[in-house]
């Protein structure tokens, strides 16, 4: 595996507004990615974190990203519909067509709906007013604590708490964790009103890889959709909410915009296991989006599965080995 650093762009879809979800509110994840190293001690990632330029005109970085040296883009759609210019979308599309990795995340209702204009991974995001969930049964209010937020608004828990996730189908590389029980990532940050994602039915490269469960209704909902790399484009992930990566959700003491009024929890701060799970997910995503599938981790997981299968295959009546000395 090459030791050249992965060039990561973390970008929001709003200008640098202090009392909003600006890029500074994702600093813990930024610093964690920047702290990762290769076996030889060299940086695993070179991270650039920025907000977009003023809306209504092409962003100077996004609109030229296909001509940049970035390996992957993590796009935090925190706008109300005007966060991406057509030239931004076209360049991001070319970037992925050239093999670039792309993570796109948003939040509840229509927050981040500018991603619908991306096509591709943008089509995996369902909103209240545009690109609605094709399953009418999902077009219902879930969280009822914040009455002005309508569907999709899945309540996985309080900000500052964590949720237990369910891995769907064959475990995806981004969900492998050899240090965890079962070799899989089990936790992500919780949020009172997550958005909705789903695999486009006409895209054979896409599948749901993880689900969560509402603490209000008990409904299961999709947390992440993975798009496998193909001749048509690089790897991609559609994530149900940017709160999985926000400082406030990793540590509520980091603060939040003034319009957030739900009482946060403290469970994540008290669970090193959940913290490790979340960091591992971020690391795995960074590697996988850059085409560096964590092969060693996959081998560890397969070896673990083989060991468990061998143990189960031994007859229960076999006596234990005894030292006769």
Short names for language-model regions:
Residues 104-218:
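An acidic, glycine-rich "communication" segment
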Residues 6-121:
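Helical hinge/lid and interdomain linker segments adjacent to catalytic or ligand-binding clefts
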Residues 97, 290-291, 315:
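Residues at helix-coil transition
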Residues 297-325:
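Intrinsic, low-complexity terminal and presequence regions
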Residues 37-41, 197-203, 230:
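Short, conserved catalytic or adaptor-binding loops enriched in Gly and charged residues
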